[in-house]
């Protein structure tokens, strides 16, 4: 199994005492007056949903701030509604969160996965509220991801879909018979075996390249008995280390994982809520997400759009505002909280696009000039409906060893237990 065996033990969360509190993450302090600027991800009076965009050119402190946000979320689990545990899945394209960064692994108790025998099954049918013909939907989603990355044609797409359906049938799973769906689902190795043994299928095209990549690299676990639910796997911080792999392989892994995550999210219970507070269950962080976002994979947008109901938030980190796209590729409409560091190629239209300032030229110009002039570990923050504010960041290195959370505003520092 690819789980790092010697990852740091996850910090223990204090048991919930029944009091509903606000989870609080300190972005930093306002440059203007030093006041704390915070994010309240479970308080719907502050942010309707917890999706966030973090932007900044290389070297501006973007990764340090992102690590700080993740670490603080881990430490704030005690304030989650009902004391629900919080899982955070990180797609790490550059190796900024893996075992070569022991301070982060130690602070968060992160487990690191490498793309070898990943212990989940993209053809799994697990869940408590499953849609009709679920095996067909699952097979079609996997096929669509492969087709997008490897530019498959209609015939190749149909061929792959047929192989997956045949694999389900070989496992005794019938698409129209929900009573069969709890049987062990086929693994990718079983799908590949059906594909490779079918002499009628052409083997020198882009479909072959895709199947061969997945099989030769042994990315997915081939033994169904050694796989688990992805939702169950994402407990605490889980880092998927994609560094050193080709872009096609990286995007394929992220696409397959997000599609499975979305399916299992949809098949799970809605998160609890009480008045203004909503239970958070999981976060997804896609680091250096621009290449993946450009391919418009449906699962990412669906998670952004529908995750709130299930207590799921998404954090997208990129180097440019324009990576959030426009038209069919518009991700900005799903983001309520923005952290913008210095951006080297910033345009005024980028500011209007993200901050919706086209009707307020004065504010747009202020933001444009502010983003262009801020220094390292400084950012412009817009959280929910609050006005944008320029802050001195709270980077990860400042809080890594401060498990008492003394960096929080005084009213939010954890109470000392009674003697």
Where are these regions (language model features)?
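Basic- and hydrophobic-enriched, low-structure N-terminal and domain-boundary segments
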Residues: 1-60, 64-65, 69-80, 298, ...
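P-loop NTPase motor domains
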Residues: 12-17, 32, 57, 68-312, ...
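H-loop/switch region of ABC-family ATPase nucleotide-binding domains
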Residues: 318
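Conserved AAA+ ATPase core "coupling" helix
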Residues: 346-354
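A short helix-turn-beta junction within AAA+ P-loop NTPase domains corresponding to the substrate/partner-engaging
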Residues: 108-113, 329-341
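Conserved AAA+ ATPase "sensor/coupling" helix adjacent to the nucleotide-binding pocket
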Residues: 353-361
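Conserved P-loop NTPase motor module
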Residues: 1-6, 194, 252-253, 369-419
């Amino acid at each position: 199994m690819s789980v790092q065996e010697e990852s740091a033990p996850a910090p223990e969360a204090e048991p919930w005492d029944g009091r509903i509190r606000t989870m609080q993450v300190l972005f930093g302090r306002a440059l203007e007056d030093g006041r704390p600027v915070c994010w309240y991800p479970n308080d719907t009076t502050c942010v309707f949903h917890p999706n966030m965009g973090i932007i900044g050119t290389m070297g501006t402190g973007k990764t340090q701030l992102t690590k700080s946000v993740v670490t603080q979320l881990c430490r704030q689990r005690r304030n989650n509604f009902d004391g629900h545990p919080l899982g955070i899945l990180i797609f790490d394209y550059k190796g900024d969160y893996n075992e070569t960064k022991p301070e982060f692994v130690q602070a968060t108790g992160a487990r690191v996965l490498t793309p070898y025998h990943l212990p989940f099954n993209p053809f799994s049918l697990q869940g408590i509220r499953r849609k009709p013909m679920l095996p067909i939907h699952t097979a079609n989603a996997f096929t669509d991801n492969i087709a997008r990355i490897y530019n498959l044609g209609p015939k190749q797409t149909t061929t792959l879909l047929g192989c997956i359906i045949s694999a389900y049938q070989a496992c005794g799973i019938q698409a129209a018979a929900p009573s069969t769906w709890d049987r062990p689902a086929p693994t990718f190795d079983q799908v590949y075996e059906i594909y490779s043994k079918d002499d009628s299928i052409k083997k020198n095209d882009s479909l072959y390249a895709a199947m061969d990549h997945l099989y030769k690299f042994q990315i997915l676990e081939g033994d169904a008995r050694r796989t688990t639910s992805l939702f169950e796997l994402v407990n605490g911080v889980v880092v998927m280390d994609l560094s050193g792999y080709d872009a096609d392989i990286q995007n394929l892994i992220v696409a397959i994982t997000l599609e499975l995550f979305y399916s299992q999210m949809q098949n799970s219970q809605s998160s609890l809520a009480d008045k203004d507070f909503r239970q958070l269950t999981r976060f997804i962080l896609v680091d250096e997400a621009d290449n993946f976002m450009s391919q418009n994979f449906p699962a990412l947008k669906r998670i952004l759009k529908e995750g709130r109901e299930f207590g799921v938030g998404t954090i997208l980190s990129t180097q440019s505002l324009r990576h959030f796209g426009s038209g069919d590729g518009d991700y900005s409409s799903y983001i309520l909280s923005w952290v913008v560091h210095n951006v080297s190629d910033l345009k005024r239209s980028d500011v209007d696009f993200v901050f919706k300032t086209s009707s307020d030229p004065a504010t747009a110009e202020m933001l444009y000039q502010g983003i262009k002039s801020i220094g390292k570990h400084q950012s412009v923050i817009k959280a929910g409906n609050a006005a944008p504010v320029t802050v001195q960041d709270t980077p990860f290195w400042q809080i890594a060893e401060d498990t008492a959370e003394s960096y929080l505003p005084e009213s939010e520092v954890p109470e000392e237990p009674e003697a």
